[in-house]
């Protein structure tokens, strides 16, 4: 599962099992807002993180997290002739919450807008989050909802934590995730997932 639930790929066959995309018509509008407010903005193709604005340390982090090469493009709105899985704003933590609210006001009726960390603002297809993706996956696999376990640490994990039979917050999770979780495990750096497997499986 990738792109905050926007795409599910069968690990063995490498085939896409499920995918939801956003309309590319929003990219010029999102890019305009990013440039006017000195924010970073990226979207994705099959192999790269496409940088539509200036590079910043948060864009470099995202490229590292998802193991994709960052590619700066001055005319990304012309290059993207397909509907992408998502776009991502990057912003300094001191202003990210403010911009999240403004972007929600501008695009919230057409797109899902939420922070996944203090410096990432996700732009997703309407109705798409990790919970929706898990619902699709377990229906395909025939797994009851009550038998699911979801582990997360960021704002973008909240819906998934609420949906799962057991919602688990990592020790390093934001407070909002810890408040919703049924159980808190160790951090990402201290085998927190292993602890969950040993306890519940």
PLM features per residue range, with description:
Residues 29, 33, 37-151, 160, ...:
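Conserved acidic, metal-coordinating active-site core of Asp-based
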Residues 5, 84-85, 164, 181:
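Short, well-ordered alpha-helix to beta-strand connector turns
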Residues 163, 168-201:
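Asp-based, Mg2+/Mn2+-dependent phosphohydrolase catalytic module
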Residues 1-25:
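Alpha-helical substrate-recognition element adjacent to the catalytic core
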Residues 25, 129, 188:
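Conserved active-site and cofactor/substrate-binding residues in soluble primary-metabolism enzymes
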Residues 5, 152-154:
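Active-site metal-binding loops of divalent metal-dependent hydrolases
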Residues 1, 149-151, 168, 185:
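Hydrophobic/aromatic beta-strand patches that form the interior of the parallel beta-sheet core
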């Amino acid at each position: 599962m990738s792109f905050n639930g926007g795409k599910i790929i069968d690990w063995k066959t490498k085939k896409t099992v499920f995918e939801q995309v956003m309309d590319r018509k929003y990219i010029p509008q999102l890019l305009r807002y990013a440039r006017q407010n000195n924010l970073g903005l990226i979207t994705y193709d099959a192999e790269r993180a496409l940088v539509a604005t200036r590079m910043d340390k948060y864009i470099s982090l995202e490229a590292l997290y998802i193991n994709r090469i960052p590619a700066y493009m001055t005319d990304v709105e012309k290059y993207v002739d397909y509907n992408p899985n998502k776009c991502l704003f990057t912003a300094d933590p001191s202003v990210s919450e403010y911009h999240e609210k403004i972007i929600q006001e501008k695009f919230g009726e057409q797109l899902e807008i939420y922070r996944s960390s203090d410096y990432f603002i996700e732009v997703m297809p309407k109705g798409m989050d990790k919970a929706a993706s898990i619902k699709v996956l377990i229906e395909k696999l025939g797994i009851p909802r009550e038998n699911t376990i979801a582990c997360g640490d960021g704002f973008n994990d909240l819906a998934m934590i609420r949906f799962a039979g057991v919602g688990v917050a990592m020790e390093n999770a934001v407070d909002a995730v810890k408040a919703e979780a049924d159980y808190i495990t160790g951090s990402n750096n201290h085998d927190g997932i292993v602890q969950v497997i040993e306890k519940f499986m």
